[in-house]
Amino acid sequence: MRVWIDADACPRAAKDQVIKFALKRKFEVLLVAGQSQVKPAFACVRLIVVPSGPDAADDYLVEHAEPGDLVICSDVPLADRLVKKGVAALDPRGRGFDERNMGERLAVRNLFTDLRDQGQVGGGQAAYGERDRQTFANALDRLLTRLSRSQ
């Protein structure tokens, strides 16, 4: 099993949590980014910097992640592409993406995009906090356990 991370948009605390699990459970972590980042100094972690361009990191993740892998991303359209391919996806706040909830998640995302474009709502998500980190860690633990049992 491999865990892929859409590294440009993922909070550092979530990346650190994945690496902590990787060291304990012995799986590979692949950080995919559109710009260079500092790679954590662990053998289980690889940094893949893709050429810059719209959706280049997303396209790389969809092309290379396989069923049985997990992708950490907050990009709902990316998660939809992954779920359709049979790849597990989880956002850094611990909310899973699957075929049952993708329609609703896409509709909500599109609604808020439209409202933002019209100036009716502003800003984005609240800052990533301790509660988010704990919720993510719990969801990650459950999902990794489920994925490891299915291999």
From Swiss-Prot:
This is UPF0178 protein PST_0536. CDD domains: PIN_YqxD-like. Belongs to the UPF0178 family. InterPro entries: UPF0178 (IPR003791). NCBIfam families: PRK00124.1. It holds the Pfam family DUF188. HAMAP family: UPF0178 (MF_00489). Transmembrane segments: none annotated.
